[in-house]
Swiss-Prot record:
Subcellular location: Cytoplasm
Primary location class: cytoplasm
SUPFAM superfamilies in the cross-refs: NadA-like (SSF142754)
GO BP, one annotated term: 'de novo' NAD biosynthetic process from L-aspartate
UniProt protein name: Quinolinate synthase
Length: 378
């Protein structure tokens, strides 16, 4: 059975990056598999990983079965940068990246001598789509006095135009450091994450107006109603969410930080405002606790993604097996672009090392206290 095609709308910043229109893209909807097919594919994938001496590197947002395969075969399930670092440091010469295209590109930039494959090269990201390099370069050229800071969710070409790359777990600290040095900033592409960091640091930040189509759907009105229904629940929010959602959070953090909070916080119930793919890892990490999806439907909300990235959903058992069997869907990054893009990535890694801070949480809430910058009433 062939995959269907799903139209997807996303925020498309207009000229100069100061206003937003609507862009149109598409995502494949994979054909469902019977239970017997799934088990056969899992066994085939395990054998192919061994045959190809490959390692599976998966994001928290992909299908639970792919996350399980990564864990069972000595791979990695992590956020985008930890995926790339794992691939760089692992002995395998073939990395299979289950995620979206910018993750494969970042893995290739950090592991230029390795073969990087992806189940589907068309798996993209609304933040990446909403920040075309030509338009972004013109935006930067119009403000030459500003330091360019881009989020990991961008193409290699956009990273190559930047001074710094950040992830959601260290962006606050890097921007605070730049602000303390008196630097004015261009921030791209996520306006919600940028606004959160700007509010926390007071930095002079000129924003590109992109957004994640998953997190942008969460709305404060419905979340507040759900909180009233479950007053004992802690609210975990990714900072790509709108300001009204962040304001209701008990913890704001990256994917890794939210998982860590679910384990460490003294609560039995959590409302989670990020891609529902993360719930698999949360349930494994904190068995016995209850996780409730933050609402993406209601009077003020929509359900364009229903809290699951349509491009992450393109990573499935069938195309994972196929890419291992055929060795296609290889990621290539132009050498000149890769060389320039590695500069802002290495700056972030060097900053983290100098400040003795991992880019993801360490697992110790006391040690990571500064990462949980937005803690509301219990």
């Amino acid at each position: 059975m062939q995959s269907a095609i799903k139209p997807v709308e996303y925020d498309r910043p207009l000229a100069a990056g100061a206003a937003c229109g609507v862009g149109e893209a598409w995502a494949k909807v994979p054909a469902p598999l019977a239970a017997g097919e799934r088990e056969a594919l899992k066994a085939r994938i395990k054998a192919l990983l061994e045959r190809e001496k490959a390692v599976l590197v998966a994001h928290y947002y992909v299908d639970a079965e792919l996350q399980e395969l990564a864990d069972e075969t000595g791979g990695c399930v992590a956020d985008s940068l930890e995926m790339a670092r794992f691939g760089r440091d692992h002995g395998a010469q073939t990395l299979v990246v289950a995620g979206v295209r910018f993750m494969g590109e970042t893995a290739k930039i950090l592991s230029p001598g390795k073969r990087v494959l992806m189940p589907d090269l068309d798996a993209t990201c609304s933040l990446d789509l909403g920040c075309p390099v030509d338009e972004f370069s013109r935006f930067c050229d119009a403000h030459p006095d500003r330091t360019v800071v881009v989020y990991a969710n961008t193409s290699a070409a956009v990273k190559a135009r930047a001074d710094w790359m950040v992830t959601s777990s260290i962006g606050l600290e890097i921007v605070a450091n730049l602000h303390a040095r008196g630097e004015k900033i261009i921030w791209a592409p996520d306006r919600h994450l940028g606004g959160y960091i700007q509010k926390k640091t007071g930095a002079d930040m000129l924003m590109w107006q992109g957004s994640c189509l998953v997190h942008d759907e969460f709305k404060g009105i419905e979340l507040d109603l759900l909180r009233n229904e479950y007053p004992d629940a802690k609210i975990l929010v990714h900072p790509e969410s709108p300001e009204g959602v962040v304001a209701l959070a008990d913890v704001v953090g990256s994917t890794t930080q939210l998982i860590d909070a679910a384990v460490k916080l003294d609560a039995q119930r959590f409302i989670v405002a990020t891609d529902l793919g993360i719930l698999h890892k949360m349930r494994l990490a904190a068995p016995g606790k209850t996780f409730i999806e933050a609402p993406t439907a209601g009077n003020s909300a929509t359900c364009k993604s229903c809290a699951h990235c349509p491009w992450m959903a393109m990573n499935v058992l069938s195309n994972l097996a196929d890419v291992l069997e055929r060795g296609h869907n290889e990621i290539f990054v132009d050498a000149a672009i890769a060389e320039r893009a590695r500069v802002p990535i290495d700056r972030m890694l060097d900053f983290a090392a100098r400040h003795k801070q991992r880019v993801q949480a360490s697992g110790d809430l006391l040690r990571d206290q500064q990462l949980f910058a937005n803690v509301g009433a219990a």
